[in-house]
Amino acid sequence: MPPTIEQIGQDMIRMSIAYALALPIGWNREREARSAGLRTFPIVAIASCGLAMLGSSFANPTADAYSRILQGLVTGIGFVGGGAILRAKHSVSGTATAASVWNVGILGAAVGFGYWHIAVVLSVVNFLTLQYLTPFKREIHLGFERAKERGGDSMLDD
């Protein structure tokens, strides 16, 4: 049976919420000039939301069906996020961006399945972690670099 106008409106609202909850995370990654940003994050969220809504629209969805939807989603988003991870000679970068892509996919699915409260928490915690823990991470890395320059192996060699 085709969806009603009311159902289409509700679906549009859900996808808009998923999009909006991903924007702050995408903005943060874009501002930091990361490989994924303002376009990627909302697209992942809205696609994940749409997939969850499609899965919920089956005549008699079972727990097993929901499980398979989530398994496929997590695998696919992991592949997308893996593209953000770069390995150089002695460093790895992009792990926070990759984890954020994965988180935004789950956020979108949460909205699609109707778990708004989970989506809001995922969005807020992800954004705050990126926004406020990044300066601490930089300070820790500077401490390690200073210790190496002094000839020690760690900051604890003092």
Predicted regions and their residues:
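Alpha-helical transmembrane-segment detector that highlights a single hydrophobic TM helix
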Residues: 62-85, 89
